[in-house]
Regions:
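Extended, low-hydrophobicity, polar/charged segments
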Residues: 1-165
Length: 165
């Protein structure tokens, strides 16, 4: 399964004409804080792909991409953008079912057709960012300008706020 997923991620990057490179990652170090420390990646160059799941109505999922140094406004912005009454972070099993990916590897590339992607505009201010590679053993270094070219994607100013140190 992971080879199929890896191929789908690469195909999505190629289809979007992305400027990117992939890097191997120890699966035990795939979570953002551990990854950044182990591989000397600045946290503000790392972007987290977060799946939100609606509770009312049930069954609506969306992917949100925010810098690791920021916090997604789930209850206000997430709910409004998804046009649902109640929303929460998708637990690992729901994330896997909705995306085919496991936490620590979720990526905007190769996501299921029709799954909306909301990208915090702050992500776009960087020359490159690191995102998941679809699996916990691969990351993708990518020029964020590609996000504006992906289908079902909206760039959202102020989607996330800076985390106080």
């Amino acid at each position: 399964m992971s080879e199929e997923l890896r191929s789908a991620v690469i195909a999505s990057l190629e289809d979007a004409d992305a400027t990117y490179s992939t890097m191997a990652c120890d699966p035990d170090l795939a979570d953002t804080a551990q990854f950044c420390e182990a591989y000397s990646i600045p946290a503000d160059q790392s972007a987290n792909a977060i799946v939100l799941a609606s509770k009312r109505p049930e069954g609506v999922y969306a992917l949100f991409l925010v810098l690791a140094t920021t916090r997604l406004d789930v209850n206000r912005r997430g709910r409004e953008l998804m046009n649902v009454r109640k929303v929460s972070f998708a637990p690992p099993d729901v994330t896997a079912t909705a995306t085919g990916m496991v936490m620590g590897g979720v990526t905007p590339f190769g996501r299921p057709a029709g799954m909306q992607l909301f990208v915090d505009a702050a992500v776009m201010d960087h020359e490159w960012v690191i995102v998941g590679g679809g699996t916990r053993d691969m990351k993708v270094k990518v020029d964020p300008e590609v996000f504006a070219r992906l289908t079902d994607t909206v760039i959202v100013p102020g989607l996330a706020s800076t985390i106080d140190p």
